[in-house]
Amino acid sequence: GAMLSHQNLLFQARNAGSWIGDEAREEIISILPLCHIAERTFSVFLPLNFKWIVNFVESPETSFENTMEVSPTLFFGVPRMWEKMHSNTVIKINEAVWLGRIAYELALKIGGKYAEYIDAGGKPNLLLRLGRWVAEKTVFRNLKIMLGLDRARILFTGAAPVSPELIAWYRALGLNLLELYGQTECAGITTSNTKAENRIGTIGKAVANVDIRIDENGEILCRGPHVFKGYFGNPEKTAETVIDGWLYTGDIGTVDEDGFVRITDRKKDIIITAGGKNISPSEIENQLKFSPYISDAVVIGDKRKYLTCLIMIDHENVLNFAQNQNIPFTDFASLSARPEIVDLIGVEIENVNAKFARVETIKKFKIIDEQLTADDEELTATMKLKRSTVEKKYSSLITSMY
């Protein structure tokens, strides 16, 4: 276990004003298990320091309903939560009458253009401001009420990579969804985008009083009062992780001329194909998860001739699709095996393949025919597929694709 000192935690709580701001007494909702350092930061440490109101969900299954009831002003969620909100909205829009669909698409284009101007530090012209106002009154306000985000001042996502397109979608709606970065060994947050400085596709700048640099191997290193004291009972691992005060995060990335940090992938997850091509699987996986029908994905291909993928389907949305198309099935496994569902996922994968170079495209895929929950060993507490566990458990399924 990682040993965190009282000083580590106090630093995070007192330093948060530099990247959150303290203009209001926030009301938040706590969804993730408190064993997760980011959730403990947002639901315990920061509320104690800033006197926020904390609401706890009744259960993971009621999290979206509880969010609608509370309508938090500040909200931290993992990418899967934001992906699910997006996919639920897309499905509902697709089921709406033609006039509703047209209004949504038009409003989204206007909102996206408006957000691009704002994020670039520009000033939208009068016509665009007027269009954005109409879009807010006719479309966006209702969507935000439906999502429980109508009072949201600031939203954060972290704990896993997120698609830039997903953040852009929320920005188009007028919601400040900001990506941040940290880990248990840093007692919480190391970098963050802010309302004043936000660059989509990055994890923001180093927060106040924290230093960031990239070593000769491309690994992100950080230094500051938030760095932990070491791993309990494991001085060897501690010595490998913290050298001369610098924490070796295990993430590969870059820092641009303005100080914004961009993560490529986990060092251990980089795929090197049989042809010697280095590929970041998370970039492909993020694009796949932007589909309303794909809950998660694991790209395979290390030391192999081509890339394949294991897909975890979004049960609710795929179930609705099957019912609307009158596709017969008996259980989750039979639903996953239906040719119509395989074709549906195949189309989504081809749409993603079109965005990447040929060597980075998915050549074959298989659907995991089990409905996984946080209690299963394949998933983390934040609903991420554990790559090594999945590759080991489904090794025969992977082998069948080569």
Feature roles, as predicted:
Residues 10-27, 34-140:
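Conserved AMP-binding/adenylation subdomain of ANL enzymes
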Residues 1-13:
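Conserved AMP-binding A3 loop
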Residues 296-299, 348-402:
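Conserved C-terminal "lid"/linker of ANL adenylate-forming enzymes
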Residues 206-273, 290:
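Conserved ATP-binding/catalytic segment of the ANL
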Residues 278, 292-296, 317-368:
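Conserved C-terminal helical docking segment of ANL/AMP-forming enzymes
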Residues 197-200, 227-250, 285, 325-336:
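Conserved ANL (AMP-binding/adenylate-forming) active-site segment centered on the GW(Y/F)…HTG consensus within
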Residues 55, 128-133, 145-157, 162-218, ...:
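Conserved ATP-binding loop and adjacent catalytic segment of the adenylate-forming AMP-binding
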Residues 252, 257, 291-317:
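C-terminal boundary motif of the adenylate-forming
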